[in-house]
Curated annotation (Swiss-Prot):
Species lineage: Eukaryota, Viridiplantae, Streptophyta, Embryophyta, Tracheophyta
Biased composition (Basic residues): 36-48
Molecular function GO terms recorded: DNA-binding transcription factor activity, RNA polymerase II-specific; sequence-specific DNA binding
Gene Ontology BP annotations: positive regulation of DNA-templated transcription
Organism in which the protein naturally occurs: Oryza sativa subsp. japonica
Name of the gene encoding the protein in the UniProt record: HOX21
Tissues in which the UniProt entry reports expression: Expressed in seedlings, roots, stems, leaf blades and panicles.
Protein name: Homeobox-leucine zipper protein HOX21
Annotated region described as Disordered, given as residue ranges: 25-81, 94-132, 239-287, 312-336
Length: 366
């Protein structure tokens, strides 16, 4: 059924005289190479004429047809009669000139090319069309609406598209691009503001650091001055204390050198009294003259002597000056009263006896 259908209705792949030419080739006897060789020797000119006729015939009929279909499968050619490469090259231009159609010849290509949604560019125009430039009035109107609100609602988008004569997609894409530019400008403005603030803070920080360094230098200078002043004051205090000590010592030395010792007068009267006593009472019966107190104490009596301890007890017990009696060889000698001041001087003299104190006792013993 399929082979009859193919035979009855010629396909667009094959030329119109394809079946007739194929039948003529099958009816023609096979070509003998020996006869061809003999004919080449005897009638070369006639063979050349036949070749020209065959070429004209092939040119008139077109390229040679493909081999007959396979006996079992009519769509496959037989393996014994496969066409050569040159025959296929000759058929290629004819196949390319005719359109390819399947079945009833519908518009499959049109459906592929025209089916689906139309691809639009960024400004809303189709991919094949040129981009539509907005005029000045449209841009101004869109800018005003963008200033009112950068977000575009569907109703507002439709109104703007109708008012400006644009597609809603064009309006939406313009708003989207405008928002992107606005964000970029805002970022640039924020960056510039932050950069100015950073520069100001850096300058202020540098000024504060310089001021801090100056203050630290002043503190170090003040500390050095305070240390120097404290050292100077300490030196002055030590010098003043040393000078005061030297002045006090000099005053003490002057006082000591100016004031005579308290028992100097008693020491001066001691030798004179000794000479008077020695000259007047040689035989023991001299007159009863006044003699110094210490000489009477040191001189022994005939009947009994007065001890120094008794003298001290008597001086501390009596209110007035003590009176002592000296029994000489011939008469009684009454001792003069001694006041408290002279007695104190005597005690001082006893504490520090001079090396040249004369003791008259050896004279009496002799």
């Amino acid at each position: 059924m399929a082979s009859n259908g193919m035979a009855s209705s010629p396909s667009s792949f094959f030329p119109p005289n394809f079946l007739l030419h194929m039948a003529q080739q099958q009816a023609a006897p096979p070509h003998d190479p020996q006869e061809h060789h003999h004919h080449h020797h005897h009638g070369h000119h006639g063979h050349h004429h036949e070749q020209q006729q065959q070429q004209q015939h092939h040119h008139h009929l077109g390229p040679p047809p493909p081999p007959p279909p396979h006996p079992h499968n009519p769509f496959l050619p037989s393996s014994a009669q496969c066409p050569s490469l040159q025959e296929f090259r000759g058929m290629a231009p004819m196949l390319g000139k005719r359109p390819m159609s399947y079945g009833d010849g519908g518009g499959g290509g049109d459906e592929v090319n025209g089916g689906g949604e139309d691809e639009l560019s960024d400004d809303g125009s189709q991919a094949g069309e040129k981009k539509r430039r907005l005029n000045v009035e449209q841009v101004r109107t869109l800018e005003k609406n963008f200033e009112l609100g950068n977000k575009l609602e569907p109703e507002r988008k439709m109104q703007l598209a109708r008012a400006l004569g644009l597609q809603p997609r064009q309006v939406a894409i313009w708003f989207q691009n405008r928002r992107a530019r606005w964000k970029t400008k805002q970022l640039e403005k924020d960056y510039d503001a932050l950069k100015r603030q950073l520069d100001a803070v850096k300058a202020e920080n540098d000024a504060l650091l310089n001021h801090n360094k100056k203050l630290q230098a002043e503190i170090v200078a003040l500390k050095g001055r305070e240390a120097a002043s404290e050292l100077i004051n300490l030196n002055k205090e030590t010098e003043a204390s040393c000078s005061n000590r030297s002045e006090n010592s000099s005053e003490i030395n002057l006082d000591i050198s100016r004031t005579p010792p308290p028992d100097a007068a008693a020491l001066d009267t001691a030798p004179t009294a000794h000479h008077h006593h020695h000259g007047g009472g040689g035989g023991g019966g001299g007159g009863g003259g006044m003699i110094p107190f210490y000489t009477s104490i040191a001189r022994p009596a005939s009947g009994g002597g007065v001890d120094i301890d008794q003298l001290l007890h008597s001086s501390s017990g009596g209110a007035g000056g003590p009176k002592m009696e000296h029994h000489g060889g011939g008469g009684n000698v009454q001792a003069a009263s001694v006041d408290t001041a002279s007695f104190g001087n005597l005690l001082c003299g006893v504490d520090e006896p001079p090396p040249f104190w004369p003791w008259p006792d050896h004279q009496h013993f002799h």
